[in-house]
């Protein structure tokens, strides 16, 4: 909890800040925190699962989205980028310590779950025409290849975000952008049907 550390502030020079941050353009403030102990995976609520996400910016943004939408845990395949990568930490904009992140074998995890499994895919059903449950697993796939075939086989439903542009020349959405839209739809639907 941040409250315990409010009095522990240190002023550093711009040069020191650049050394600490490892980024070309560091923020003016850097937070330090202990890497939390692994908590057991929850088996309820809405859980986001990431299959082979490679881009640190995407993972950091998805962590921030989980925080925004009140999703307390994120499950990642073992080959997803490390959540403590400096670029992930920066992109999460302070949300990282509030989200429980688990790296695990997705096939084993999904086979043990009793929640409905939704996969985001370009060829899925229109998400805007579906009633979405409060408790589910939403799987988002790799930036270039989507969700792997071995994971797709475990899905109960495949959903997509329809395109509305007339020319439809854009190939796909960025995985973090798609995650934002789908999480909004899961949460919006749950508010409508309370």
For the regions a protein language model found, what residue spans apply to each?
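Short, acidic/turn-prone active-site loops that include or flank metal/cofactor-
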Residues: 14-17, 79-81, 106, 143-145, ...
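Active-site regions of enzymes building and remodeling cell-envelope glycoconjugates
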Residues: 4-15, 45, 115-117, 133-137, ...
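Short, hydrophobic beta-strand segments that form beta-sheet elements in well-ordered domains
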Residues: 1, 9-11, 32-33, 101-102, ...
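Arg/Lys-rich RNA-binding interfaces used to dock onto structured RNA substrates
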Residues: 1-55, 187, 193-194
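Short beta->alpha connector loops at strand-helix junctions that form conserved
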Residues: 12-13, 51, 77-78, 100, ...
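RNA substrate-binding interface of SAM-dependent RNA methyltransferases
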Residues: 2, 40-124
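Structured adenosyl-cofactor binding patch, chiefly the S-adenosyl-L-methionine
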Residues: 65-69, 83-97, 149-194
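Active-site/ligand-binding-proximal alpha/beta "capping" segment
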Residues: 119-169
């Amino acid at each position: 909890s941040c409250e315990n550390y409010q009095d522990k502030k240190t002023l550093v020079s711009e040069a020191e800040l650049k050394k600490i941050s490892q980024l070309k353009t560091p923020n003016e403030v850097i937070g330090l925190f202990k890497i939390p102990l692994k908590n057991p995976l929850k088996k309820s609520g809405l859980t986001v699962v990431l299959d082979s996400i490679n881009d640190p910016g995407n993972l950091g943004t998805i962590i921030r989205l989980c925080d925004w939408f009140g999703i307390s845990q994120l499950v990642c395949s073992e080959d997803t980028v490390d959540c403590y990568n400096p670029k992930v930490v920066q992109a999460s904009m302070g949300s990282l310590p509030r989200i429980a992140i688990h790296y695990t074998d997705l096939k084993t995890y999904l086979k043990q779950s009793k929640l409905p499994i939704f996969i985001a895919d370009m060829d899925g059903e229109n998400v805007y025409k579906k009633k979405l449950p409060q408790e589910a697993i939403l799987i988002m796939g790799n930036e270039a290849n989507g969700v792997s075939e071995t994971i797709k086989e475990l899905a109960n439903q495949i959903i997509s975000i329809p395109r509305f542009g007339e020319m439809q020349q854009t190939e796909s959405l960025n995985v973090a952008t798609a995650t934002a839209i789908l999480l909004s739809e899961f949460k919006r639907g749950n508010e409508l049907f309370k």
